[in-house]
UniProtKB/Swiss-Prot annotation:
Keyword Cytoplasm tagged: yes
Family: Belongs to the DeoC/FbaB aldolase family. DeoC type 1 subfamily.
Enzyme nomenclature, EC number: 4.1.2.4
Active-site residues, as the UniProt record annotates them: 89 (proton donor/acceptor), 152 (schiff-base intermediate with acetaldehyde), 181 (proton donor/acceptor)
Gene from which the chain derives: deoC
Gene Ontology CC annotation, any one: cytoplasm
Protein keywords: Cytoplasm, Lyase, Schiff base
Catalysis performed (reactions): 2-deoxy-D-ribose 5-phosphate = D-glyceraldehyde 3-phosphate + acetaldehyde
Protein name stated in the entry: Deoxyribose-phosphate aldolase
Pfam families: DeoC (PF01791)
GO biological process assignments: 2-deoxyribose 1-phosphate catabolic process; carbohydrate catabolic process; deoxyribonucleotide catabolic process
């Protein structure tokens, strides 16, 4: 298995500098990761630097709380795509899900899917650490109904990250035709292999190089 092609090489910290982003971009070129996942402010730089390379440009929408309005998320998506993003990882409205407002949650995802249609993959971050199993299932079902390409465990900025149990539940819920992304706390090759075995088709990590090189030291970042 070519683990590198399953990894979104990620840097999303608030204090990320241009030098940090360039390092991630160069590593993505060298190790041929699936994508670089960066904050929207870095999308144009990443798109320019990765032109001609088989590495997608992934960014985040409504991140990390998911509490911005649907209209804002749709605009963010269009803006990111205009600047060169080919994948977007959006955060659901977690509070609305917990309120049982399925209509709002689905519309929130649907509008981002429509904004990205034909131009970028949409991954929906459900923030599993804040949800009951019933809520995880419902979030996945609403994501599929709204037309998302992937469901994703975590932002890496909340109270917990990916677990093999959550990945298995999400895979069972969405079936074989929707992607499942494990993110948050995936730091070693062993972590990544566990997630893939449980059903993940993509892994988000900042420790991507350590994972590929099977460096047991891994990394300390949550993402």
């Amino acid at each position: 298995m070519n683990i590198a092609k399953l990894i979104d090489h990620t840097i999303l910290k608030a204090n990320t500098t241009k030098e940090d982003v360039m390092k991630v971009i160069e590593e993505a070129k060298e190790y041929k990761f699936a994508s670089v996942c960066i904050n929207p402010t870095w999308v144009k730089l990443a798109a320019d630097e990765l032109a001609g390379h088989d590495v997608d440009v992934c960014t985040v929408i409504g991140f990390p709380l998911g509490a911005s309005t649907t209209e804002t998320k749709a605009f963010e998506t269009k803006d990111a795509i205009a600047k060169g993003a080919t994948e977007v990882d959006m955060v659901i409205n977690v509070g609305a899900l917990k309120d049982g407002d399925n209509e709002l949650v689905e519309k929130d995802i649907y509008e981002v899917v429509q904004a990205a249609k034909g131009k970028a993959l949409v991954k929906v971050i459900i923030e599993t650490c804040l949800l009951t199993d019933e809520e995880k299932v419902r979030a996945c079902e609403l994501s599929v109904k709204a037309g998302a390409d992937f469901v994703k465990t975590s932002t890496g900025f909340s109270t917990g990250g990916a677990t093999a149990e959550d990945i298995a539940l999400m895979r069972k819920t969405v079936g074989p035709n929707v992607g499942v992304k494990a993110s948050g706390g995936v730091r070693t090759r062993e972590d990544a292999d566990k997630m893939v075995a449980a059903g993940a088709s993509r892994v988000g990590a900042s420790a991507s190089v350590a994972i590929v090189l099977n460096d047991a030291k891994g990394a300390t970042d949550n993402y």
